[in-house]
Amino acid sequence: MTRFLFLVRHGDASPHDGPLSPAGQEQARLTGRRLKDVPFSAVYHGPLPRAAQTAKLIAASLPGVPVTASELAGDYIPSNPDPEDLPRRFADFVASFPAAERAAGAARAEAARERFIRPDDGAPDSYELVVTHNFLLGWLVSQALDAPPWRWLGLNQMNCAVTVIACQPGLPAALITFNDASHLPPELRWTGFPATLRPASI
């Protein structure tokens, strides 16, 4: 009765808010090949083109699995933390978004947490894939680990890296893997990731 939530950040896009770049398309295809044997019951993706296109390319390796757009998997600020709780750089970043946008994002993120980070009381084990964006992915990981609500800040994912969270009745959620890009060749890793956080020779 374990519920496995697979989270994938969209592929590299060019421009950032546009469709996938050629590299992003290849990242998505390779991610689909990696996940082809996982018995998914559903694939969800954010409504923006880069997430929708990534999901479509992944789903090409998952015949018969329904693919659905979801606003919950979109690109938004997932919490509205007190600036006093944040490092200054994070506080300035959050403050750059309008208050109404932050409030709406926090409500949507809570709905996403309730929808995706929950145990499955049925049997057998279940598997779902969510193709989403950096902020929400970090938020879901932070919530699975009972971290402070603002701790999605600084949790960065590479494009098309795979994160897996397992939920079981009566137990805290378990982070199985985070930001795993081992299915991508070196030249397709680390896109979308802050250069200042990339370790040398990895």
Question: Language-model segments: what does each one mean?
Answer:
Residues R29-A100, S201-I202:
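Phosphate-coordination/substrate-recognition cap region in phosphate-metabolizing enzymes
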